[in-house]
């Protein structure tokens, strides 16, 4: 731990030293001969002897400037040079740092026949709620797709799953030339569109894409827009890749894109077995917002192969895959403001996983341990189709989305747990169909009416077979048997419909909404034993379920929007009457629940200044459980966990409060934000577990329970013009308090996690780029009734160097170092290194790239994971070294 603190302290001192190295300032004003201020004049601080530029800036709107002077620099060794278009350049000596150095420039008399202005300094342009980054200011020759550039933009961060955030707020969409081709599956664009086809990246704050509602209904969404270059709009764009390597690896990417005003398309075929998980490209980054909008609790997958954990590594470090993805995305502007869009993909993969894990559960006076080794194979086939018709006019909006999803997944597992050998086959085939219709129309009175209708059907038949039989004493009265078969399915019909009426005014927009929703479900499950003579019977009378469920809801809502320029606010006051009926004749279960709820929500955004704002959020929400909270028969969710319910339906009161401040100074490319969040959940029941060395039984008891969560996080990003570097940092502190019952003991847990992040991206010269990122994570968990506690420290460092000696040759070297410390265990240290060389064959307009991934050939990885009183020690098999030769060309 001391070593970690020294490393963190060294990082902190490095940051401070960069700040302290500019300990003095010189300031002044720049005016013309009449005394009028000259904005945007270039002010250079130079060494009087060598004429080298020490620092520079530009004047603000009042003609003033401030220059940072390096520490321990004598004033008489410096001069200030001021340049402005149409005026003569003027140079002055500095007598001292206390007195201002003012300039009065005289206009040039001679006519300039030709003026060429070169400025390599990145500039952000602001216009209203839109901030514009010029791609060429931040790109480098090694950047192949636009996602490579977005990662380096000041104020923007990209998570490991591709989620983009601007000043710590996730973006809602990424538009392409102003059109929404992909909804929230924007990783398709960021991982495919060539960076050379994009002229600018725009950040749109307070994005309200529905024209009827603009300046009437508050939106605090943030979206990105990719501005396409003119020449890229005139032709088909494509970056093709064909690669092969050792041991038996391949990587193929064939794509064709079009970005015309009336037609946009991203269509491609990808396949690889190099650890590149193509499923990351079709991730929906805002699925939580979608589920909140449709207000439907989609049943989660119930069964699994075991408590598998994912290593905290980059995917290509540990993934054994054989992936293929056909992805088709096409948008046609039928006429002005009328669009037809088709998004479809088919994904096939075969993934292998070898890992071993020891799970330690710390109980009062006892410790339970599980040991398991698994050799897994997953074979998903995923189909997705979406048709969207959109009319988006000033007075009329129509949006209809037809969605169909089907997945056929078969998973195989060879499991060795303690003294048992088990083969598992798990089949999971979810099917989803839905149609979402939304109509908004502005009347002659300027009032707005809205009609909404959503209907869906969902089913997910699950089947898991475990063989040979194990735990005979529990499942078959001490008689040996052949197989244990668990089946589960929860088919669901759902519809949600409402009418809304909005009354806009200069100050407040009033909205009134009323509607209803109906959910109809049936949960069926059975745990069957296949005897050695192939006869089949239930494991017991309490391992079967047939639950019928109906939830009906009627609601009315009043909302008030203040869409001002300084103060934006939304107050929503919904009233809900819902009735839930559920029954299961197998357990003489027949219950009804009627509740009337009031769930107020308040959102406030106050513009402190032109670029800075304060946000407030409060949400009180009553939540009622789902059909998965009421089944009485046991379900074997994995090979060693039986779960059932004995309490009434779960009811929760969820309170969420948050406050945040966002700072931006576009002129100097400086961004920072800080947010605090508190979440309190009170429930009418509590989870209880009986844990033994052979099995874990879970059940829900009717006992009042609450959880509390506090989160504090901050981010900072600054571009240094002098160092040509984007510096970024982040910090997060989170505390979670919860209560569980384990082996009849009431255990309150407190888990605290802290994260510190520091990164830099430097353009050393036109030939050399360097990036560095360090992430320190600390997790500790303990129970008030037990003195024992766990504490884990993890440090990840990543560095990359790019070197382009000539235009046609590029070299890249990168590395990752993982360090984990947990008291009582040896330190875990891993280092991964990659290298590549790219050669441009100008005659063929083709690139050849030779790469070596994990060239140090690290083939195992150990990791520690902590949750409440459960510690998991896992060991994974890695693919090892991959050598790949790629042929890349454009069409």
Predicted feature residues:
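Outer-membrane beta-barrel transmembrane domain signature of Gram-negative proteins
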Residues: 374-382, 386, 440-442, 482-570, ...
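Transmembrane beta-strand segments that form the barrel wall of outer-membrane beta-barrel proteins
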Residues: 235-246, 265-269, 575-579, 645-647, ...
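Periplasm-facing N-terminal accessory domains of Gram-negative outer-membrane beta-barrel systems
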Residues: 22-110, 152, 157, 165-167
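Outer-membrane beta-barrel translocator domains and adjoining extracellular loop/strand segments
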Residues: 94, 214-215, 279-284, 352-368, ...
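Conserved C-terminal beta-signal and adjacent last beta-strands/turns
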Residues: 757-776, 790-891
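Outer membrane beta-barrel strand-and-loop segments of large Gram-negative receptors
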Residues: 538-545, 555, 644, 650, ...
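Membrane-proximal, glycine/serine-rich, low-complexity loop/turn segments characteristic
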Residues: 35, 62-64, 72-73, 85-99, ...
């Amino acid at each position: 731990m001391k070593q970690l603190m020294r490393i963190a302290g060294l990082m902190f001192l490095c940051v401070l030293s960069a700040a302290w190295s500019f300990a003095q300032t010189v300031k002044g004003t720049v005016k013309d001969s009449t005394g009028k201020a000259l904005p945007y004049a270039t002010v250079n601080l130079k060494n009087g002897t060598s004429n080298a530029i020490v620092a520079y800036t530009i004047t603000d709107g009042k003609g003033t400037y401030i220059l940072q002077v390096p520490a321990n620099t004598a004033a008489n060794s410096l001069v200030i040079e001021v340049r402005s278009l149409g005026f003569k350049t003027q140079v002055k000596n500095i007598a001292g740092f206390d007195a201002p150095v003012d300039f009065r420039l005289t206009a040039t008399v001679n006519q300039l026949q030709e003026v060429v202005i070169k400025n390599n300094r990145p500039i952000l342009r602001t216009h209203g709620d839109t901030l514009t980054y010029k791609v060429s200011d931040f790109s480098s020759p090694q950047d192949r797709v636009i996602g490579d550039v977005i990662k380096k933009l000041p104020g923007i961060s990209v998570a490991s799953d591709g989620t983009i955030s601007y000043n710590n707020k996730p973006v809602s969409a990424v538009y392409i030339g102003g059109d929404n081709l992909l909804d929230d599956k924007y990783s398709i664009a960021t991982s495919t569109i060539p960076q050379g086809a994009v002229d600018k990246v725009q950040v749109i704050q307070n994005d309200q894409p529905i024209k009827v509602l603009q300046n009437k209904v508050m939106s605090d969404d943030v979206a990105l827009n990719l501005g396409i270059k003119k020449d890229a709009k005139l032709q088909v764009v494509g970056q093709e890749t064909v690669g092969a390597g050792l041991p038996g690896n391949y990587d193929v990417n064939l794509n064709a894109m079009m970005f015309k005003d009336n037609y946009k398309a991203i269509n491609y075929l990808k396949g690889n077995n190099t650890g590149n998980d193509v499923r990351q490209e079709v991730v929906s980054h805002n699925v939580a917002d979608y589920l909140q909008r449709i207000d439907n609790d989609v049943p989660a997958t119930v069964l699994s192969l075991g408590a598998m954990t994912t290593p905290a590594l980059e995917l290509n470090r540990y993934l054994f895959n054989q992936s293929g993805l056909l992805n088709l995305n096409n948008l046609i502007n039928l006429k002005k403001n009328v669009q037809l869009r088709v998004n479809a993909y088919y994904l096939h993969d075969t993934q292998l996983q070898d890992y071993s894990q020891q799970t330690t559960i710390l109980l009062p006076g006892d410790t339970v341990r599980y040991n398991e080794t698994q050799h897994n194979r997953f074979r998903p086939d995923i189909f997705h189709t979406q048709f969207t018709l959109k009319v988006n006019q000033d007075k009329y909006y129509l949006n209809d989305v037809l969605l169909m999803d089907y997945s056929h997944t078969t998973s195989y597992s060879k499991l060795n747990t303690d003294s048992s050998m088990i083969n598992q086959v798990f089949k999971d085939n979810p099917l989803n169909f839905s149609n979402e219709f939304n109509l908004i129309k502005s009347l002659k009175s300027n009032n707005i009416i809205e009609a909404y209708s959503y209907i869906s059907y969902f089913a997910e038949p699950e089947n898991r077979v475990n063989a040979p039989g194990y735990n005979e004493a529990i499942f078959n009265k001490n008689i040996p048997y052949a197989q244990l078969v668990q089946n589960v399915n929860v088919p669901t019909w759902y519809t949600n419909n409402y009418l809304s009426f909005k009354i806009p005014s200069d100050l407040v927009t009033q909205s009134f909404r009323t509607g209803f929703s109906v959910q109809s479900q049936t949960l069926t499950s059975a745990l069957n034993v296949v005897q050695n003579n192939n006869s089949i019977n239930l494991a017991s009378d309490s391992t079967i379920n047939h639950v019928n469920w109906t939830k009906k809801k009627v609601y009315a809502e009043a909302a008030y929007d203040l869409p001002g320029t300084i103060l934006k606010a939304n107050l929503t006051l919904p009233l809900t009457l819902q009735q839930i009926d559920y029954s299961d004749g197998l357990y003489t279960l027949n219950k009804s629940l009627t509740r009337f709820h009031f769930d107020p929500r308040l959102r406030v955004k106050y513009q402190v200044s032109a670029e800075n704002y304060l946000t407030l959020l409060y949400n009180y929400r009553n939540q009622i459980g789902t059909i998965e909270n009421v089944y009485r028969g046991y379900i074997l969710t994995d090979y060693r966990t039986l779960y059932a319910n004995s309490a009434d339906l779960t009811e929760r009161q969820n309170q969420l409060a948050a406050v945040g401040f966002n700072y931006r100074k576009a002129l100097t490319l400086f961004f920072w934000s800080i947010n605090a969040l508190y979440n309190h959940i009170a429930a009418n029941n509590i989870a209880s577990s009986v844990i033994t060395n052979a099995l874990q039984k879970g059940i829900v008891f009717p006992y009042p329970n609450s959880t509390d969560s506090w989160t504090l996080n901050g981010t900072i990003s600054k571009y240094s013009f002098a160092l040509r570097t984007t510096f970024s940092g982040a910090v997060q502190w989170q505390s979670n308090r919860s209560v569980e019952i384990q082996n009849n003991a009431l255990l309150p847990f407190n888990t605290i996690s802290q994260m510190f992040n520091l990164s830099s991206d430097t353009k050393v010269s036109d030939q050399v780029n360097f990036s560095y990122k360090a992430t320190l994570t600390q997790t500790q968990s303990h129970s008030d009734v037990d003195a024992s506690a766990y504490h884990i420290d993890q440090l990840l460092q990543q560095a990359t160097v790019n070197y382009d000696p000539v235009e046609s040759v590029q070299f890249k070297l990168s590395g990752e170092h993982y360090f984990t410390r947990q008291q009582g265990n040896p330190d875990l240290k891993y280092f991964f290194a990659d290298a590549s060389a790219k050669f441009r064959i100008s005659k063929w307009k083709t690139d050849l790239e030779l790469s070596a991934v994990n060239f140090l050939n690290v083939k195992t990885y150990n990791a520690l994971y902590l949750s409440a009183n459960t510690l998991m020690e896992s060991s994974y098999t890695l693919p090892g070294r991959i050598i790949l030769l790629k042929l890349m060309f454009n069409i």
